[in-house]
Swiss-Prot record:
It catalyses: (S)-malate + NAD(+) = oxaloacetate + NADH + H(+). Transmembrane segments: none annotated. This is Malate dehydrogenase. InterPro entries: L-lactate/malate_DH (IPR001557), Lactate/malate_DH_C (IPR022383), Lactate/malate_DH_N (IPR001236), Lactate_DH/Glyco_Ohase_4_C (IPR015955), Malate_DH_type3 (IPR011275), NAD(P)-bd_dom_sf (IPR036291). It comes from Agrobacterium fabrum (strain C58 / ATCC 33970). Catalyzes the reversible oxidation of malate to oxaloacetate. CDD domains: LDH-like_MDH (cd01339). The keyword NAD applies. NAD(+) binds at G10, S11, G12, M13, I14, G15, D34, N96, I119, T120, N121. HAMAP family: Malate_dehydrog_3.
Length: 320
């Protein structure tokens, strides 16, 4: 049986980390792509040389020609410009939209059957544009945001309660930005909803709100500390979890920026929602019931994403 092929489009910090994690899990052979020739080849060689030490068998190669991604089963897109301190994800829109146009054309030509995971920011608008530029089926193009945002929420909760991260489930809806909606009612510690833990006196409603706000600011906190770029270990781990669920048909329930066509009252937009990811790509969007407050927060988030999509159309009218 031939090994699966994973194409990593963009070989910066996330791209290199993705290549290492995919190798360690032996998900398939890996092609690192970047327009900066030499970087993907160098990183590929470096990671391949860790194989004898770490005991994995995976072929790694680097390229600066899209022909190298031909026939890829999975494409993970990180190409584009990362945030610097003081920038919002939305500030990257104009530059990264042009990158998505080139990436979309490359995937359309060489890997039209791939499952595509987009990480480039501003995430929800970029994955929407990438799907349109590539023409791939909507269930095969998805954005990585919810797994990462939920992981941040889970970590902060685990630290607050001094419990294992494995016993914390967390739920984040909406766009990957300042308007994301971490849902306390659907997030649990040992199966007990956070709203019940507040009633039990484990934490105050004010403290919970602080943790929710830190989750929203999770990426900016790291950007502020690094000063020269943005997060890469946790984003890469999050995308690998999604890719693995697709490649192994695990049917994991994972939050992702998925294409909505009527669900949650949203049409032709990518927004973070709970999904089932299996061999068919996004096999199902799970619609949960929202109360008035949650619905209002979700619609505010949807509005922010819609504004970004409109800005994309102004730059590239072909997206209409």
């Amino acid at each position: 049986m031939a090994r699966k092929k994973i194409a990593l489009i963009g070989s910066g910090m996330i791209g290199g980390t993705l290549a290492h994690l995919a190798s360690l899990k032996e998900l398939g052979d890996i092609v690192l792509f970047d327009i900066a020739d030499g970087i993907p080849q160098g990183k590929g060689l470096d990671i391949a040389q860790s194989g004898p030490v770490e005991g994995f068998n995976a072929k790694l190669s680097g390229a600066s020609d899209y022909a190298a991604i031909e026939g890829a089963d999975v494409c993970i897109v990180t190409a584009g410009v990362a945030r610097k301190p003081g920038m919002s994800r939305d500030d990257l829109l104009g530059i990264n939209l042009k990158v998505m146009e080139q990436v979309g054309a490359g995937i359309k030509k060489y890997a039209p059957n791939a499952f595509v995971i987009c990480i480039t920011n501003p995430l929800d608008a970029m994955v929407w544009a990438l799907q349109k530029f590539s023409g791939l089926p909507k269930n095969k193009v998805v954005g990585m945001a919810g797994v990462l945002d939920s992981a941040r929420f889970r970590l902060f909760l685990a630290e607050e309660f001094n419990v294992s991260v494995q016993d914390v489930t967390a739920f984040v809806l909406g766009g990957h930005g300042d308007t994301m909606v971490p849902l306390a009612r659907y997030s649990t510690v040992g199966g007990v909803p956070l709203t019940d833990l507040v009633k039990m006196g484990w934490l105050t409603a004010e403290r919970l709100e602080q943790i929710i706000q830190r989750t929203r600011d999770g990426g900016a906190e790291i950007v502020g500390l690094l000063k020269t770029g943005s997060a890469y270990y946790a984003p890469a781990a999050s995308a690998i979890e999604m890719a693995e669920s697709y490649l192994k048909d695990k049917k994991r329930v994972l939050p992702a920026a998925a294409h909505l066509s009527g669900q949650y009252g949203v049409d032709d937009m990518y927004v973070g929602v709970p999904t089932i990811i299996g061999a068919g790509g996004i096999e199902r969007v799970i619609e949960i019931e929202l109360n008035k407050e949650e619905e209002a927060a979700f619609q505010k988030s949807v509005g922010a994403v819609a504004g970004l999509c409109e800005a994309c159309i102004n730059i590239a009218p072909s997206l209409k």
